[in-house]
């Protein structure tokens, strides 16, 4: 697919992804950051994976209901890839080309952690799917929120209340510990892009850590961005 070039004189938006295990606080922190960016007159939107576009939301319902698991790891991975392809080309890239910051709750790292590390899908398969679905699109910053497994699972249980756990929340402690380890390994393999933040702290402390990472790794590097650095 041929991508439209950004309009002349229009700065490309920044692409920030949030990753982490269940109950790590991604949704809370991504919305706090969006509010701060918009208050600073930087247009920002919040989106998510799986989902984020009409077609991808249909697939989200399918995989979180557990149907994807019944098809096997590789078929489930293809479902995630289909959702990502639609999301990238209908939401993420068009927004970035308009100078809008895109804050995404999960992206390709989640596939590498969940389907790669835990589903044993071969790296070569994941690499091939990424070439097709995202091409050269790479986050300007990936925030990995790290929280002890037991605490994350407790938070997830409180969040859903009397509702049933989704396909991934229902997994056992060992699964979630492997997931936490996978994210730490991803961060270690790409330290320029990824920052790990202790999400066991209170909401405001975590938010301050997220902002500091954005300030030091993205805002300072972008001389065109006029925003308070504190």
From Swiss-Prot:
InterPro entries listed in its UniProt record: P-loop_NTPase, Thymidylate_kin-like_dom, Thymidylate_kin_CS, Thymidylate_kinase
Binding site for ATP: 20-27
Gene Ontology terms describing biological process: dTDP biosynthetic process; dTTP biosynthetic process; dUDP biosynthetic process
EC number: 2.7.4.9
Keyword Nucleotide-binding belongs to the record: yes
Catalytic activity: dTMP + ATP = dTDP + ADP
One term of GO molecular function: ATP binding
Stated role: Phosphorylation of dTMP to form dTDP in both de novo and salvage pathways of dTTP synthesis.
HAMAP family on file: Thymidylate_kinase
Record's protein name: Thymidylate kinase
Species, as recorded: Nitrobacter hamburgensis (strain DSM 10229 / NCIMB 13809 / X14)
